[in-house]
Amino acid sequence: MLDKDLILNDNTYELSQISRHKTHVVEVGKVKIGGNNPVVVQSMALGVHIDADNIKSSAKHYAKEITELARTGSELVRIALNSEEVARAIPYIVEEINKEGFDGKILVGCGQYELDKLVQDYPDNIKMLGKIRINPGNIGFGDKRDEKFERVIEYAIMHDLPVRIGVNWGSLDKYLLQKLMDENSSLSNSRPSDVILRKALVMSALDSAKKAEGIGLNSNKIIISCKVSKVQDLILVYMALAKSSNYALHLGLTEAGMGNKGVVNTAAGLTYLLQNGIGDTIRASLTQRPGESRTNEVVVCQEILQSIGLRYFNPQVNSCPGCGRTSSDRFRILTEEVNGYIKTHIPIWKKKNPGVEHMSIAVMGCIVNGPGESKHANLGISLPGYGEKPVSAVYKDGKYFKTLQGDNVSEEFKAIIDNYVKEHYT
């Protein structure tokens, strides 16, 4: 049965602004995470083997990858603090990325078993980072875990470093998990084990955060994450975190996968949470193909944020998928060329033409939807489909602008784009 009142009510179609979950603002160098600040994009460097006999040269190679990620748009870059060699390399890494115009505080040190020892042995090096990450599940075990956790938190307090308390279901505190599992099994109406696992993740993160506060770390120095591999688990865990606390939240799957699977899993989980106002910083943990740059994980995060209107990074190109009416590859070739043109020119445009990242461009392949779709964009072009005249209509801000034809359609359309940018974004 149709609800005509609902269908006819204009409010049904009103696009409301995403209401962000209220969280504490955490400052990581010059980057602000949480509150009403833009959702921050971060990544993790794959890293290189640090040669103990040639620390400076190794650091230069490490910094090259970090710089590539930062230049793509990663606002924070995580590095693994997994050896003395890495700790010794930090000043040289910072020096190299400073040369490229990036602040050393974009670096986040991710420590595991070795973190307690490294902050004691290399305090002046690690304080050069913007943030450190602690995994409560493997910083230590038994009483030693509490001692090591306390020492790292005290170090962070001393050097005014924010901390991400990052729980991972692959390295969850086994004592807490076993305790909750035992309690559950003793109940007459026991719950499925996956429910208890999610509960343990949230409890581990929040208990550790409260413990850090008890030691003296302010809540505006704490970021929380609970990493899992399944989208539905991610959603349930972060909804529970948002209901239970106001800590800034770092979103991401612990391992999303390779190729389309990794991108889809990341987009599915993060988009749902972000659309519901949950999440202050994000990462796409993608498995890159051999030889593929890790910058793709930065681009995926940017695309997710732009797709739901939370942030804008580049002009949006909407393009036709093709069908039986598209008789050639011209629309595909033009789409690729337009994307390449934007990628080449966007660094200059962003400096000279503020707001250009909000621009929309449509490249369509035939007359059926071409003109209509083009009119919804700032600039649109409708290429000829099967049986149509070999001409391409260009639309500007919803109105017919001109017709292009011949062998120079691509160059002429790119010139139109460039002129539009200069005219409308100053």
Swiss-Prot record:
Keywords: 4Fe-4S, Iron, Iron-sulfur, Isoprene biosynthesis, Metal-binding, Oxidoreductase. One of its GO terms (molecular function) is 4-hydroxy-3-methylbut-2-enyl-diphosphate synthase activity (flavodoxin). GO terms for biological process: isopentenyl diphosphate biosynthetic process, methylerythritol 4-phosphate pathway; terpenoid biosynthetic process. Binds 1 [4Fe-4S] cluster. NCBIfam families: ispG_gcpE, PRK00366.1. Converts 2C-methyl-D-erythritol 2,4-cyclodiphosphate (ME-2,4cPP) into 1-hydroxy-2-methyl-2-(E)-butenyl 4-diphosphate. This is 4-hydroxy-3-methylbut-2-en-1-yl diphosphate synthase (flavodoxin).
